[in-house]
Curated annotation (Swiss-Prot):
This is Altered inheritance of mitochondria protein 23, mitochondrial. GO terms for cellular component: mitochondrion. Residues 321-336 have a biased composition (Basic residues). It comes from Candida tropicalis (strain ATCC MYA-3404 / T1) (Yeast). Residues 311-320 have a biased composition (Basic and acidic residues). Its main location: mitochondrion. It is found in: Mitochondrion. Residues 1-26 form a transit peptide. Keywords: Mitochondrion, Transit peptide. Residues 306-341 are annotated as: Disordered. Signal peptide: none annotated. The keyword Mitochondrion applies. It holds the Pfam family mIF3.
Amino acid sequence: MSLIFRRNLSTCLKLFQSTGKPINRFQTLYGNKSSPKSQGNQKRTKRMINGNKNHHHHHQQQQQRSERIIDPRKFEFKEGSETSKSAISSLISKIYYQSSNFMVEQVGESGLIKIHLSKILENLNLSKQGIQLIDRPKSDDDEGGRLLPLIKIVPIQEMNSWYNDLLAKSKQIELLEIGSVKTLKTLEIKLKQEQKKSATKEFQLKWSISINDLKNQKKLEIQKIIQNSKTQKSFLINVVYNKSNPGRLIDTIFKDEEDLEIEFKKRELLKKILEEEILNDLDCKWSVEGDLKTKLVYQVTPKQIQQETNKSVDKEEQPKKEKKKKQLHTQAKPKSKTSEEDLDDLYSFKIED
């Protein structure tokens, strides 16, 4: 035992002499930064930090998924009729054709609002409200040379009527493809009627017209238009240079000052004849826009139409006036009776005196 103790003591003394410093075994174990255990601890802390970051990112992804916008094509309406639902689905497909991400511009009270279509559909009561897709021209400012679809909230009846017209047109196209003769005839009649209703008749006069022609032939033509005013509400008389360049300046036509003065006086005379001798003599009302340097546009309305409109207004007002007269008459009757009774009482009182 003593020998073993001596050996251990001698080895310890040798080590102490070689280093010159007391040995700390804990420092050798944990004090060395480059030890593999300390590196493992550092890696462990890095993993913890990265793990927290990944957890936060995963949480954000979950929130984004929860706030994800619904595809308008998959939107289910609880309210509204089947016609309304099919009408709005047809409009959604039209909007998708114009904007694949369903970003639209809504017509609001404060102006145009850029919004996703699903947000509009969420707040829409399909039993009362619908949407309207307003036509917009193409523009180079927007992506792909197109503006965003313009959406307006309208009453449900307006959307349903649009859808019914769409169905009717599609049926007509189907019948035309089959080769139905009846549909062709009805379409032609409808087109003619629409053209008559929408088109405003225009009567052209050139500045180069002679005064005799204006007083005779053109006056008769204008008179015929006014007489046939049952089908035409109002019409325009355009006094122009020519059809290709109607509003050409007088200075560009006549360079010489004398010619310019003569032309200007002639135009003044034509204007005077047209207004005083033709339009004022005929049964119509008129207003004029433009000037003698370029062109004149007269809007002429026959008085027959105005008389008919006044008659219709009078017819509506007549029953109201009659009712008022009856009410006044009924109110006046008891007053007259009371006044007669008062007179009788006074008369009898005087006789007694």
